């Protein structure tokens, strides 16, 4: 199938393609989650969730593999790194808990509501879940092995945040020789609106391809349907 994309169309074989859902957790998209508590605007997250659901429904119907990234750490935050790690200094979740000690153990800790995937996008049978502890879903995970074992070469990225974990993962995919596509209306940024456009520009010009949910769903719906 040929996907209309920028800067040029890209051909994707469904059996060699996966949709990668980046960090669609309560932490990043729900009122009362870490991102909301840290002061970021999450008002666009509801629309993002709806567009991701549309994407996943179409992908599963066509037999395209769905892979979830889930970001966070153990309840004691050992995996987050201590003061010797730049993550300790830059993670807004960790900084928020240091400012508000009453939140300690609640933000991005495995097993908590904050860490959980949002109700609307719960993984389905056959989907793959890849836990991660840093922005990129390729760092210290089995993601590369998961993809190579299945002959997957093309990755369609959706999720939050466009300019952090989505872009970090797509860049690493590029460096590992994967073809990365970002569905711009199925991602949401953290920060001013121009941040979204900056990532779109980076992906389009340097690291991959940019497309829309409607274009992806329109093309993938023409693939042979999955039969039992």
UniProtKB/Swiss-Prot annotation:
SUPFAM superfamilies: Isochorismatase-like hydrolases. NCBIfam families: RutB. Pfam families: Isochorismatase. The gene is rutB. PANTHER family: ISOCHORISMATASE-LIKE DOMAIN-CONTAINING PROTEIN (PTHR43540:SF6), PEROXYUREIDOACRYLATE/UREIDOACRYLATE AMIDOHYDROLASE-RELATED (PTHR43540). Keywords: Hydrolase. This is Ureidoacrylate amidohydrolase RutB. It catalyses: (Z)-3-ureidoacrylate + H2O + H(+) = (Z)-3-aminoacrylate + NH4(+) + CO2; (Z)-3-ureidoacrylate + H2O = (Z)-3-aminoacrylate + carbamate + H(+); (Z)-2-methylureidoacrylate + H2O + H(+) = (Z)-2-methylaminoacrylate + NH4(+) + CO2. Belongs to the isochorismatase family. RutB subfamily. GO terms for molecular function: hydrolase activity, acting on carbon-nitrogen (but not peptide) bonds, in linear amides. GO terms for biological process: nitrogen utilization; uracil catabolic process. Hydrolyzes ureidoacrylate to form aminoacrylate and carbamate. The carbamate hydrolyzes spontaneously, thereby releasing one of the nitrogen atoms of the pyrimidine ring as ammonia and one of its carbon atoms as CO2. HAMAP family: RutB (MF_00830). The keyword Hydrolase applies. Its EC number is 3.5.1.110. The active site is at 23 (proton acceptor), 132, 165 (nucleophile). Transmembrane segments: none annotated. It comes from Agrobacterium fabrum (strain C58 / ATCC 33970). The keyword Ion transport does not apply.
